[in-house]
Amino acid sequence: MKYVALAFVLSLVILQISAQVGAAYIPGMGLGSVGRTGAVAGASAGVGNQGRGAGILRLLSIIMELVKNNQQAQPKQDTFGAQLQSLLKKKMILEMIN
């Protein structure tokens, strides 16, 4: 959840920088007042403010996709130890029976 908040704050900062500088240094920000287009990774965007809005939405969707992929890439819980303990318990039970 903190990554989502960080991504949102970062996008607002980028938007503010883009509006102040008036140039599309970051893909997708566009020049709202001048009317140039902006796009992220070749995404279609309108002119002016529409271009900036489309670029920001695309940027946020890319960030959300990265966060989702990062969460999926987390290592799974190792079950080898649990399986080993289970086998040892079974072996002890068998030894007790014999």
Swiss-Prot record:
Name the UniProt record assigns to this protein: Uncharacterized protein 3
Gene Ontology CC annotation, any one: extracellular region
Tissue/organ expression: Nacreous layer of shell (at protein level). Expressed primarily in the mantle with highest level in the mantle pallium and lower level in the mantle edge.
Main location, first listed in the record: secreted
Annotated compartments: Secreted
Source organism of the structure: Pinctada maxima
Signal sequence range: 1-23
Keywords: Secreted, Signal
